[in-house]
Regions:
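Single conserved hydrophobic/aromatic residue that forms the stacking wall/gate
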Residues: 2-7, 11
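C-terminal soluble interaction/assembly domains
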Residues: 52-56, 130, 458-459, 471, ...
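Second-shell loop/turn segments in exported
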Residues: 29-35, 49-56, 157-158, 330
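Gram-negative/organellar outer-membrane beta-barrel architecture
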Residues: 38-39, 58-299, 388-389, 395, ...
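Acidic/histidine-rich, surface-exposed loop or edge segments in extracytoplasmic proteins
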Residues: 43-51, 256-257
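C-terminal outer-membrane beta-barrel translocator/porin domains of Gram-negative envelope proteins
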Residues: 17-21, 30-35, 114-117, 230-427, ...
């Protein structure tokens, strides 16, 4: 397929000297030549072209055209060539844009390793993909997935500490901003995609089984270099818990007797949310490669759920259903607001050594129709991406010391506020091995006081005394396409203890204070 951007619209094949044997059509003053049939809509081709007829040659326009066409998954490759209109007048150029069609359908099988905050596992999936559903390079994906994970930190109550997941999901991705009233000029200025998705997942944990059904409509776009935006315009999730283990149910019943807020995190719930995410990375995506120069990244995420449904229930004069609050089809809906801030700075000392600083803060506040956050929206501390002197989900909230028998602590050790601080020195050792020395600090807290999470509530005059501190060493395998990270952390300050036990750094004990972690990426 060739498009020539000029006023005369006379197009020649650069290889054969003519377009004999090609069909053609004209769209908005542009002639398009093709064989058999057009595999992309003419409007899409015009919208994704940045070269304008009658304007001065611009290398930037050429590169922007390559970049725009590169986002069309239906294309195998694109090539732009320029040729003088005639020998006597070298000031005018004809632009030839040659597009090669790629494979529009594919089936793939994937096997992957998983790492959920330090819990290791494996997953397998089979997917079907169609890259040109409506002749606009729309990508339809259907995937069936199964996963297994070994869970840590459950205590001794469970003989089976395995987690299994089965699910099916589908999505339809559009290579442009699909929203009414937006002009073509605006769409050309940003690199955007729109996606609608459906998903069903069945999860079986040792303590409960859970089913999740979701539907979403989201946008991703970039209007400047290094900046990414994501808008979840509508994200509807229904969480259904068909069964709970006897021990877990007994524990929840006990919570009910104590009027615990935690029990509300493990009930059926409808989550209708909107969210926005802003990401800036001065060095591009460095998650899977070692940075080579000083850089920094910033991520801000905000989301809300339930406000429109709560307002509609009020306007309709609905009656709350006891502790469930307002319901839709007898299903309570969650209402909360949540915000996350993440900043990381990498200082390159020299090509072999660097110093990294990171801070992460998260706050979520349930209100209105919710007494507590849904389980999947709560914060946890400890693990490979948090305070590495503690195993995953074993720290906090606040100064919570855990139950006397150590049972079910993984339920209680969650919160509404999270703080993570990290400083790390990195050095190249040899070959593909890098070493690191780190100091971590942080914890989680609850917003409301709960009898089951004693000393876990956030207080301004107390929280800084409850910040846990850890130190340790790590090894990184830089395999170019990914980084394997192994860390060993030791507790330095333990807010769960009092007296001399609060400062294990003064009397370190390996069996008590050490935690090992494996992760992918920095």
């Amino acid at each position: 397929l060739s498009i020539r951007r000029q006023r005369q619209m006379c197009i020649r094949d650069s290889r054969k000297g003519s377009f004999t044997g090609f069909d053609s059509l004209s769209y908005k003053g542009y002639n398009m030549y093709y064989k058999d049939k057009m595999f992309l809509r003419p409007k899409l081709l015009v919208d994704f072209n940045r070269i304008r007829p009658g304007e001065f040659y611009s290398e930037r326009d050429v590169q922007n055209t390559y970049s725009a066409l590169g986002r069309l998954r239906m294309l195998k490759y694109s090539n732009i060539r320029f040729k003088e209109v005639n020998v006597s007048d070298s000031t005018k150029l004809d632009a030839y844009i040659v597009l090669s069609k790629g494979q529009n359908k594919s089936v793939s099988f994937e096997i992957e390793g998983t790492n959920s905050a330090g819990d290791l596992g494996a997953a397998a999936s089979i997917s079907f993909q169609h890259r040109n559903v409506f002749k606009g390079s729309e990508t339809f994906t259907m995937k069936v997935r199964g996963a297994y994970e070994a869970i840590t930190g459950l205590g001794q109550d469970y003989v089976n500490d395995n987690y299994t997941e089965y699910g099916v999901e589908s999505s339809l991705n559009f290579p442009e901003f699909m929203f009414p009233f937006l002009s073509s000029d605006f769409k050309r200025k940003i690199k955007a995609t729109s996606e609608v998705g459906l998903k069903f997942t069945s999860q079986v944990r040792p303590e409960f089984s859970r089913m999740l059904a979701s539907a979403s409509w989201s946008y991703r776009w970039s209007d400047r270099k290094h900046i990414q935006h994501r808008l979840d315009l509508a994200d509807i999730n229904y969480v259904y818990m068909p069964s709970k283990s006897p021990d877990f149910q007994e524990y929840l019943d006990k919570m009910t007797a104590n009027n615990s807020l935690l029990r509300a995190s493990y009930e059926n719930v409808l989550i209708v949310r909107m969210g926005y995410n802003f990401t800036y990375n001065s060095a591009g995506n460095t998650m899977m490669r070692t940075p080579t120069k000083s850089s920094y990244s910033l991520r801000v995420n905000v989301e809300e759920a339930g406000n429109l449904m709560y307002a509609a229930s009020k306007l309709a004069h609905s009656t709350p259903k006891g502790d469930k609050g307002f319901v839709l089809a007898n299903i309570p809906f969650a209402q909360y607001i949540k915000g996350d801030f993440d900043f990381a700075k990498n200082f390159m000392i020299d090509p072999r050594n660097s110093f990294v600083f990171h801070i992460g803060v998260g706050v979520a506040y349930p209100y209105g129709n919710s007494r507590a956050l849904p389980f999947e929206k709560r914060y946890f501390s400890g693990g490979a991406n948090s305070v590495r002197g503690w195993s995953v989900r074993s720290l906090g909230p606040g100064g919570y010391k855990g139950s006397s028998d150590g049972q079910m602590d993984f339920i209680k050790q969650s919160g509404d506020i999270k703080l993570d601080l990290n400083v790390e020195y990195r050095t190249h050792l040899f070959w593909k091995l890098n070493g690191a020395a780190f100091i971590d600090a942080g914890n989680i807290w609850t917003i409301r006081s709960d009898s089951e999470q004693e000393d876990g509530v956030f207080k301004f005059n107390k929280f800084y005394k409850q910040i846990a501190v850890a130190y340790g060493l790590g090894i990184r395998f830089d395999l170019d396409y990914l980084i394997l990270r192994f860390d060993g952390g030791m507790k330095a300050i333990n807010p769960m203890e009092t007296g001399k036990g609060r400062y294990p750094i003064t009397r370190p004990r390996f069996s008590r204070d050490f935690a090992f972690h494996f992760a992918v990426g920095y």
